[in-house]
Amino acid sequence: MVHFSSILICIIINTMSTKVYFLKDNTENWGPVHDYLSGFVSAERREKINRYKFESDRMLSLYAAVITRLAIVRETGIKNDELVFDCPYMKKPTLSAPMTDTPLDFNFSHTKGAVLMGLSTDSTIGVDVERIRKAPFNTMKMVCHPAEADYINNSSDKEKAFFEIWTKKEAYTKCMGTGLSVDLKSINTLAAPICENIETFIQDGYVCSVCTLKK
């Protein structure tokens, strides 16, 4: 567990092949700690961060970049300033240099106040995080499989159930590399084999889902 003032980082999955980091932040404004952390990312990433209109989005983008670098450095022993990333439009970022002995797959997600980042050495990985809040139930017919809709409607905590399903679906489609361009209603995250590859956690008021598929 790591503390930077109001920033908390913890590992919620820690196995030989997979690490998942959760970051929570209560900071409302950009400050000295963010200037400090900016020194750990590339000039290109800083430029991208600065293009965001709102400070909250800039901070989340910075956290996602820093925690990704932290995870890779810890896993590989490569120095931070040696890391080079390829970030194709609308696709998962990859580590383009240096070459590692073991192929790495990683993914991150952020929402208001939190970042989730996952890294795996033997699987493709997709992650998603959402704060539990008032859910947009009017979207269920467009995005939920009938079995998922039944699960939500029969739950005693419908908001939590909605975001459980939503994060599972996001994590799965990110892991598959399709994103949300597919017919989401056709994907049942509660049925095998999909459900066997997804883990979902509640962490500090957030729903976190992690999908891994063996390479």
Positions of the model-derived regions?
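N-terminal amphipathic/basic-hydrophobic helices that include classical n-h-c signal peptides
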Residues: 1-15
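Core catalytic alpha/beta fold that binds nucleotide/phospho-ligands
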Residues: 11-215
